[in-house]
Design a protein with these regions (language model features):
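Topology signature of small-to-medium multi-pass alpha-helical membrane proteins
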Residues: 2-148
């Protein structure tokens, strides 16, 4: 379909919309699983002391911010799959919340001196890069009228 001046009709979405939407949902679903594991006392007991100390000393507000990040990211993936324009808003909230949680982990949690390079890439660099990508892609999809 061709778009009109009002943007009320959708162009045919590129196949990548489905891949990115599903990837965003799975990535953030894994983040929700990670959050649930960090809140489980049995799992915490099995963590290395340094990692457990970070999780146990984290204020409740940071845990809530982390939850907002992964939940909004998963919702953003669903919004992409449903071709809804709210995807970019969800991904923006997710990215901003991730930045706050990551900054807290670096500044107050001393994560850079505790985590291995692999853990830094997984817990700090990965969320920032994927968050930026999902936000960029959802904005691109909206501009191309793949989502309404």
């Amino acid at each position: 379909m061709k778009n009109n001046n009002e943007g009320s009709t959708l162009n045919k979405a590129h196949w990548s919309l489905w891949v990115v939407g599903l990837t965003a949902f799975i990535w953030h679903g894994l983040g929700l699983f990670n959050l649930a594991m960090q809140l489980n006392p049995n799992v915490l007991a099995q963590m290395p002391d340094s990692h457990r100390a970070i999780a146990e000393s984290r204020p409740v507000w940071v845990t809530i911010i982390f939850a907002l990040s992964v939940l909004n990211g998963a919702i953003g993936g669903v919004h992409l799959l449903l071709k809804m324009k709210f995807a970019s808003s969800s991904f923006l909230i997710s990215l901003l919340a991730a930045v706050v949680a990551i900054l807290h982990a670096i500044i107050k949690g001393n994560a850079l001196s505790i985590f291995s390079p692999f853990e830094i890439s997984l817990a700090i660099i990965g969320p920032l890069i994927t968050g930026l990508f999902f936000l960029w892609y959802s904005i691109k999809a909206k501009k191309k009228f793949w989502i309404r």
